[in-house]
UniProtKB/Swiss-Prot annotation:
Membrane topology of this protein: Multi-pass membrane protein
Subunit-level organization: F-type ATPases have 2 components, CF(1) - the catalytic core - and CF(0) - the membrane proton channel. CF(1) has five subunits: alpha(3), beta(3), gamma(1), delta(1), epsilon(1). CF(0) has four main subunits: a, b, b' and c.
Chief localisation class: plastid
Functional summary from the UniProt entry: Key component of the proton channel; it plays a direct role in the translocation of protons across the membrane.
Protein name: ATP synthase subunit a, chloroplastic
Family of this protein: Belongs to the ATPase A chain family.
Organism: Aethionema cordifolium (Lebanon stonecress)
Lineage, highest ranks first: Eukaryota, Viridiplantae, Streptophyta, Embryophyta, Tracheophyta
Pfam families (alphabetical): ATP-synt_A (PF00119)
InterPro entries linked: ATP_syn_F0_a_bact/chloroplast, ATP_synth_F0_asu, ATP_synth_F0_asu_AS, F0_ATP_A_sf
Length: 249
């Protein structure tokens, strides 16, 4: 009996050890200062940032009295972000327009890059490149930035009185109110990660099973949903900031 229980315990420990070592996909890492850095995310994120900065510099470096098509497009995007920020935050939306705009544009271009840029052509020693938002590290980082932003907004507006919201309308709700602030970044990150990952997986499966023409409608649908996900993330981030400044749920 002792031998049998020892064998069972050994199998369980080995099984749990193997499960704990499982990774989703293959990853390419850099060693920087003793830290293991996920290189795929950094490379694609730098490409997205370069696209955003490069397009902005090309359009606004020589503004025309009669706006060009590029100027009109950027002005439209700016007005759109202002409207979203004002609707969700209120009268004090001005300082938060750059933050909300950066979130929206980075997520939007990242999502679209997964469908429009030929990442698969670039060969890595391990793994392959994909949209930055296809990785949970990116979406969690964006969600944590949002959390820091709405805590900062509430504290800068109300000081330490901001924390009184956790015992409103009754102190009994203190654990639930605290839990709510932890679930906000989780819901933001997993919603974005899940949608982008699922979209890319569906396209990959369809391309491998059927001719290229058939998955095209699904790819267009993916572009549409990618834009919607960027809008949802930016809108919720602005809503959380507005909520922390106003103090209502």
């Amino acid at each position: 009996m002792n031998v049998l229980s020892c064998s069972i315990n050994t199998l369980i420990k080995e099984g749990l050890y193997e499960i704990s070592g499982v990774e989703v996909g293959q990853h390419f890492y850099w060693q920087i200062g003793g830290f293991q850095v996920h290189a795929q995310v950094l490379i694609t994120s730098w490409v997205v940032i370069a696209i955003l900065l490069g397009s902005a510099v090309l359009v606004v470096r020589n503004p025309q009295t009669i706006p060009t098509d590029g100027q009109n497009f950027f002005e439209f995007v700016l007005e759109f972000i202002r409207d979203v920020s004002q609707t969700q935050i209120g009268e004090e939306y001005g300082p938060w327009v750059p933050f909300i705009g950066t979130l929206f544009l980075f997520i939007f271009v990242s999502n679209w890059s997964g469908a429009l840029l030929p990442w698969k052509i670039i060969q890595l020693p391990q793994g392959e490149l994909a949209a930055p938002t296809n990785d949970i590290n990116t979406t969690v980082a964006l969600a944590l930035l949002t959390s820091v932003a709405y805590f900062y907004a509430g504290l800068s507006k109300k000081g330490l009185g901001y924390f009184s919201k956790y015992i409103q309308p009754t102190p009994i709700l203190l654990p639930i109110n605290i839990l709510e602030d932890f679930t906000k970044p989780l819901s933001l990150s997993f919603r974005l990660f899940g949608n982008i990952l699922a979209d890319e997986l569906v396209v990959v499966v369809l391309v491998s099973l059927v001719p290229l023409v058939v998955p095209i409608p699904v790819m267009f649908l993916g572009l549409f949903t990618s834009g919607i996900q960027a809008l949802i993330f930016a809108t919720l981030a602005a809503a959380y900031i507005g909520e922390s400044m106003e103090g209502h749920h």
